[in-house]
Amino acid sequence: MISHYAVHVKNTSLKSTRDKYLKILAKQNKIKGGIPDISNNPNDSESIPNKLKALWETANYAAMMENMDTSIGMVLDQLNSLGLEENTYVFFSSDNGGGSNNAPLQGGKAKMWEAGLRVPMIVAGPGVPENSQCDQPVAQWDYLPTFHALAGSKASLPNDLDGISIKSALEKGNAGKLPSRDSGFVFHFPAHYTVPITAYRKGDFKLMRHLNTGEIKLFNVAKDMSESKDLSNTMPEKVKEMTQKLDAYLGKVGAWSMKEVYETRENELNRWIEIRKQRIIEFKEQLKAKDIENNMRNHLKSQLIKATDEIVRYNKIKDQLAKDRLSDKWF
């Protein structure tokens, strides 16, 4: 398994590739003097106009894409040189949707809208027809049983796996018959740092529930991938059916509620605050010593300031957490 930081961490492109795109964009936008490379000095970006920052982001994104493409090409070339291409399956995918524009899909990374959940999956290997396409929804937890089937393993798998083998879909596309997926696709995301939503897909329909308010949305994502037409008011029976199945699954696996998440986060912040308060007491006691060296005195003073600042920061986070608990935003 190869896990690329591109396109993820901002400064992971090669300088030579990044410079190439900085020059291209500078020429296209008629930027005299070129676009500065701020990757090694992010603090300098404060003095750079927003337009140049945006162009740098574009150049860096393009460079990361090219570097990733080159890296994957090197892996494929090595497989070919070793004569393994006819006996190897290559899966290419992503852990979540993109963090920027994902039109026509809504949302993106860390969101339960389709742009956060739908990712590319490209597969090459024995029995997979070239240039074929399959529209059957699958999930990455299907990989284990799929690899098991592709390898022809006789070893038994646990009975409680969430995933299914998608071998038939890889080989026959939409004509492939997949095993029954009783639980559907459940994406339970009771997060305190973003919009808390549970998404549940069963067949063509996707139900979304806001975990602060309980508000429900329903979409036919097979026909409406942009999730522009909420069907919850016109299909109450479908909402009831899917809600019951979703709640049964969440209860079965012991899924956390938002109340538990918020309380855990608040307790964590309170614990950090108490630790800093205790440190402040200790630092002040140490500073009372008359024989303390100047270097140590300065160090303790800086640590005292740091602990005080951290208490202020954690209290601000608590204030924001209290506001987030009342938020009804979907994005």
Predicted segments with their positions:
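Glycine-rich beta-alpha junction loops
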Residues: 4-6, 190-192, 264-268
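Active-site-proximal cap/lid insertion segments
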Residues: 1-144, 148-161, 199, 209-212, ...
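WW-domain-binding short linear motifs
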Residues: 181-188
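Conserved glycosyltransferase catalytic-site signature
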Residues: 140, 162-164, 183, 193
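Short, surface-exposed beta-strand/loop micro-motifs that present aromatic residues
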Residues: 196-209, 217
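Long, internal low-complexity/basic segments
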Residues: 49, 143, 212-215, 221, ...
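Acidic, glycine-rich loop-and-strand cores that form catalytic or ligand-binding grooves
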Residues: 161, 168-177
